A protein has these predicted regions:
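Conserved CoA-thioester-binding segment of acyl-CoA-metabolizing enzymes
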Residues: 1-56
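Hydrophobic/aromatic residues within transmembrane alpha-helices
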Residues: 15, 53, 65, 120-121, ...
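Glycine- (often His-adjacent) and acidic-residue-rich active-site loop
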Residues: 22, 55-97, 113, 143
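Charged catalytic carboxylate motif
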Residues: 30-34, 90, 97, 196
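Glycine-rich beta-to-alpha active-site loop
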Residues: 58, 92-142, 146
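Acidic, divalent-metal-coordinating active-site segment for phosphoryl/phosphodiester hydrolysis
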Residues: 115, 171-177
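C-terminal long alpha-helix characteristic of the crotonase
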Residues: 128-133, 161, 175, 184-207
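Hydrophobic, secondary-structure "cap" segments at the distal end of domains
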Residues: 152-161
């Protein structure tokens, strides 16, 4: 099954990261092209005027697929040259497709958004979070260099100092701190998040 599901409700596209048994981890073979295909379908449908991105199950996205990293498979397989290609053809395709989406994109962060998952959320124009959500860019804790574009984007969202603090410490922050820092716009109870995201999407689509 595709990593990204697409549902259309009138002028709104709902895109759902769909690997709930792995907290929507990303980086398996084919994830990049799958996300690109969904984004292309959204752009091709001129009746779609806004999109909402969320995660299936209890997480938005736990980030890169650590199991695939350990097994050296998917985007993380092979020799260093191959890993570079895996990032270019898989991970980078995911973030570029979302960042370059031609309609406004809202991230409805329904749970943990960690590492690549946090950076994927940041590709949206607007970020809303459930009150229990956690966000962090924890690459250094895994001995990784942030390589998905988030290190470029994060300082532009929350400022250089706070971005450096998150990147250098690997700290995970709660939704209230994320709102205080400007990483998310609004916080809602978990059972209200998607409803509020849809209300906002409908307002945007109506402009």
């Amino acid at each position: 099954m595709s990593i990204l599901l697409l549902e259309k409700r009138g002028p709104i596209a709902i895109m759902t990261l769909n690997r709930p048994d792995m907290m929507n981890a990303l980086g398996q073979a084919g994830d990049g092209p799958a996300v690109a295909a969904v984004c292309a379908e959204v752009v091709a449908d001129k009746s779609i005027r806004c999109a909402v991105l969320t995660g299936a199950g209890r997480a938005f996205s736990a980030g890169g697929d650590v199991k695939a990293m350990k097994e050296r498979s998917g985007a993380f397989g092979g020799k260093p040259y191959d890993v570079r290609g895996g990032y270019r053809d898989n991970i980078h395709v995911i973030v570029r497709s979302l960042y370059n989406l031609e309609v406004p994109l809202i991230s409805a962060i329904n749970g943990p958004a960690i590492g690549l998952g946090c950076d994927v959320a940041c590709m949206a124009d607007i970020r809303l979070a459930a009150d229990h959500a956690k966000l962090g860019v924890t690459f250094l804790k895994l001995g990784l260099i942030p390589g998905d574009g988030g290190a470029w984007l994060l300082p532009r969202l929350i400022g250089a100092s706070r971005a450096a603090q998150l990147l250098f410490t690997g700290d995970v922050i709660d939704a209230a701190t994320a709102k205080e820092w400007g990483l998310v716009s609004e916080i809602y109870p978990a059972d209200e998040l998607m409803g509020e995201a849809m209300k906002l999407a409908e307002r945007i689509a109506g402009q």
